[in-house]
């Protein structure tokens, strides 16, 4: 039985799951409270404010039902020092420091996997909720000071009237203020709740986040990603050019 471990954050972990699936699955362990150490060890500073204090037992509880819904995950638990691990997914971190490519390809390179894994979905949501055709999540990380013209263009196409927003309440308030979109907010207490809402959508719109990772992993038919602009697109960790359902703006 293979035993995998990861320290987070949420999106990093979600993008590691194609490796777990490709290797036949197994048990998965979350290494808690490592974000500050990771920031200091690999970047010489604390992690960005949105990751500080994360990957605690609260995050584990949030993830648990979603992780166990994946057919290739036989168990999901927290890491302890006595736990034997066969595949340490945190091994990707030294190569990730320079942001050379997307997460999935980097994980594959780390584990010497030559098969292309970054061209297809890898996640399951057991109970998709199809009543929300357009799902939006826009966090406060890696967004421009002023939203680009694509938001206005999508609004002109009528997507606003079909949309709901998922994420934190303060993100929702900021999104409405930034874009002028007036859409309902749907609370999703667990990652599985969030995945079920996203899985039922025809379109996902959002920036770099765990919700975007879910949308890509679930294979939502149309994904509009508001990409970070502080580096070339082809070095963006969430850039998957072989996934034709994803466009970047």
Regions found by a protein language model. Give the residues of each.
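Catalytic machinery of carbohydrate-active enzymes
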Residues: 1-249
């Amino acid at each position: 039985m293979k035993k995998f471990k990861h320290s987070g954050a949420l999106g990093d972990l979600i993008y590691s799951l194609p490796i777990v699936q490709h290797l036949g699955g197994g048990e998965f362990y979350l290494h808690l409270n490592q974000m500050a150490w990771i920031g200091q060890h690999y970047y010489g500073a604390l992690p960005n404010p949105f990751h500080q204090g994360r990957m605690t037992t609260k995050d584990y509880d949030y993830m648990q039902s979603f992780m166990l819904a994946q057919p290739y995950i036989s168990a999901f638990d927290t890491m302890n020092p006595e736990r034997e691990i066969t595949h340490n997914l945190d091994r990707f971190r030294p190569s990730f420091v320079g942001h050379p490519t997307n997460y999935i390809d980097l994980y594959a390179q780390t584990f010497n996997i030559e098969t292309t894994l970054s061209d297809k979905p890898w996640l399951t949501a057991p109970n998709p909720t199809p009543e929300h055709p357009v799902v939006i999540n826009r966090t406060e990380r890696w967004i421009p000071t002023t939203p680009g013209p694509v938001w206005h263009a999508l609004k002109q196409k009528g997507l606003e009237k079909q949309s709901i927003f998922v994420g934190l309440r303060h993100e929702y308030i900021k999104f409405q203020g930034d874009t002028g979109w007036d859409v309902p907010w749907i609370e999703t207490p667990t990652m599985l709740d969030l995945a079920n809402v996203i899985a039922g959508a025809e379109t996902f719109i959002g920036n770099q986040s765990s919700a975007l990772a879910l949308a890509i992993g679930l294979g939502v038919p149309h994904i509009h990603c508001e990409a970070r602009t502080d580096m070339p697109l082809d070095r963006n960790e969430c850039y998957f050019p072989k996934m034709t359902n994803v466009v970047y703006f």
